[in-house]
Amino acid sequence: MALKSSKAVSEEQHGYEFFGPPGAFAISFLLPVLVYVFNFVCNDISGCPAPSLLSPKTLSLDKLKQEVGWPQDGFAGLVSWEASAATAGYILLSLILYRVLPAHEVEGTELRSGGRLKYRLNTLYSSSFTLAILAAGTAAQGAEFPVWTFISDNFIQILTANTIFSYAVATFVYVRSFSVKPGNKENRELAAGGHTGNMLYDWFIGRELNPRVVIPLIGEVDLKEWLELRPGMMGWIIFNCSWCAQQYRNYGYVTDSSICITLVQAVYVFDSWWNEPAILTTMDITTDGFGMMLAFGDIVWVPFVYSLQTRYLAVHPVSLGPVGLAVMLSLIGLGFYIFRSANSEKNNFRTNPNDPKVSQLKYIQTKKGSKLLISGWWGIARHINYLGDWIQSWPYCLPTGLAGYQILNAGAQAEGALVMRDGREVVQGEAKGWGMLITYFYILYFAILLIHRERRDDDKCHRKYGEDWEKYRKIVRYRIIPGIY
């Protein structure tokens, strides 16, 4: 649903981002390969990383394939009808719940055309309903609940199904974007940076700003907003729970480290669902087009990369103990407090500047009419919320310790080995520390992501506000980390 207004805003100048077409190609076709590498190299067959990778001089492709569990029928084994059907069913369930469960409608920010789009928000209800079904199944059947065993048995094939889906969605919205006409009554718009004329880049970055489709029996769905918070974020929690169940099947217990990561990540996800209206003011919704970048990120990258730590712990359990657990919870509490307080302050100021909670905040009145906060959280750093977000990433990775393990055959009787129920033994051995390249990848990646997003936002705001933004930067000097950066 769209609301019209007579006001219109001219399109800002916009150049290439992500190093233009070469960067778009690399991200679109190499990142999916990286996800497969992570999930093959760190496995429950031979180790994390696969032992052959620690001895490159004697490395052979045939031996590596055996160690990582490469399908016997090659690339064809990466796909299965069962995993594809399960993925389709999961997406269909999410769409049905989006339509049938109660929701409240919220207007988005003003578009360049002067209109506003309406959004149907009920992610918290639909996701809670799904989790309730999974909880009931787990209560009845424990770690052998078929959903958990299906995920662990078909994980690579599920990854393939979701990857294909992300490519399909990106291609569909790109082709459909050519039907956008100026002044259309649906308030369809092209993204400012998404129609450069380079097909690959526009497909990657997203040509249409807010693509919407009408699905039979479901109704209108805003693809970008729906995918941002639903299948991928929900999948993140589901995968974590699946790996906790796998750890229980392997050892007969679930460690505090697995529980800690699963719970703190669930809190992060539930917070985004609880504050779903706030997403409508983010760069993803207001500025970026919807293309391969967001489709792959939402559908594949988030659930399959963000759950790497619990997948690791399913094979190599780590006990934090009371002190370690307290440190992890303190970090997540600090990060969450900064992240949510800063975002709430900004959102409250934008939606109701007369609210007593934010009415005392100082700001710069720009020539464009917008107000730039220079006190409160946003007077400390231009993106202080990113600092909180990054701090929250530490407890996701730290519980894995000096990661790395090797899996030995049953009866090896290795000293200090963890013994699985099937008799196989897990030791760190020469792999100790090397697994950190995988389990700590998230901290490094997330730092790069946040720095890049801040730079993009800074460039966008400088183009938009000009001298006012330069004045703002002199007052609020630091970008993300006060006193450092």
Swiss-Prot record:
InterPro entries: ERG24_DHCR-like, Sterol_reductase_CS. Its main location: membrane. It comes from the Eukaryota. Signal peptide: none annotated. It is found in: Membrane. It catalyses: 4,4-dimethyl-5alpha-cholesta-8,24-dien-3beta-ol + NADP(+) = 4,4-dimethyl-5alpha-cholesta-8,14,24-trien-3beta-ol + NADPH + H(+). GO terms for cellular component: endoplasmic reticulum membrane. Pathway: Steroid biosynthesis; zymosterol biosynthesis; zymosterol from lanosterol: step 2/6. NADP(+) binds at K346, R350, L373, W378, N385, Y386, D457, C461, H462, R463, K464, Y465, Y472. Disulfide bonds: none annotated. GO terms for biological process: ergosterol biosynthetic process. Reduces the C14=C15 double bond of 4,4-dimethyl-cholesta-8,14,24-trienol to produce 4,4-dimethyl-cholesta-8,24-dienol. PANTHER family: DELTA(14)-STEROL REDUCTASE, DELTA(14)-STEROL REDUCTASE TM7SF2. This is Delta(14)-sterol reductase. It comes from Fusarium vanettenii. The lineage of its organism: Eukaryota, Fungi, Dikarya, Ascomycota, Pezizomycotina.
